[in-house]
Regions:
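Iron-sulfur cluster-binding electron-transfer modules in prokaryotic oxidoreductases
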Residues: 1-153
């Protein structure tokens, strides 16, 4: 986005992105193992109309969603499921969207929202790439033709 190759839609344009709040879940792989913390937030910050609300536990000190420890394939026998606890932390921010950059975390957070029931309301979990893609301005000059079955356009 900084180089101008990706352009966001005008937030005042009806096709643009409406103002919304989101919180970002740092995946263990990106944040703790690779130190990728600021970059996803920079991408989200470049999306018009986005207000980022941090969870108490974030960055290198973030709280695992449970996928990294293989908990997505296990049932907890005691206590609260890890993804339910992380989802609760995200909901506590009051954000409308929980963003993440890890497909496994996304599954865990979506399951956590489903389990949260009414408390989750209309909160959704989305990948950073989905949020960015939805904000991009259409560039008709760059669109590829649609091919129809039988070779026609």
């Amino acid at each position: 986005m900084e180089g101008g190759r990706l352009r966001s839609a005008d937030p005042g344009d009806p096709a643009g992105v409406a103002t919304r709040t989101l919180t970002y879940h740092d995946s263990c792989y990106l944040a703790r193992y690779n130190g990728v913390i600021a970059e996803p937030r920079a991408v989200l910050g470049a999306v018009p109309g986005v207000e980022l609300r941090e969870m108490d536990k974030n960055g290198r000190g973030g709280f695992c969603c449970g996928a990294g420890g293989g908990r997505m394939w296990m049932e907890e026998t005691r206590g609260t499921r890890i993804n339910a606890e992380r989802t609760r932390q995200a909901l506590d921010t009051g954000a409308e969207t929980i963003a993440t950059a890890c497909p496994f975390c996304l599954v865990m957070l979506k399951d956590g929202l489903a389990d949260a029931g009414e408390r989750a309301g209309s909160v959704q979990a989305q990948d950073v790439a989905e949020i960015l893609a939805a904000s991009l301005a259409a560039r008709p000059e760059r669109q590829l033709p649609v091919l129809r079955p039988g070779g026609g356009r």
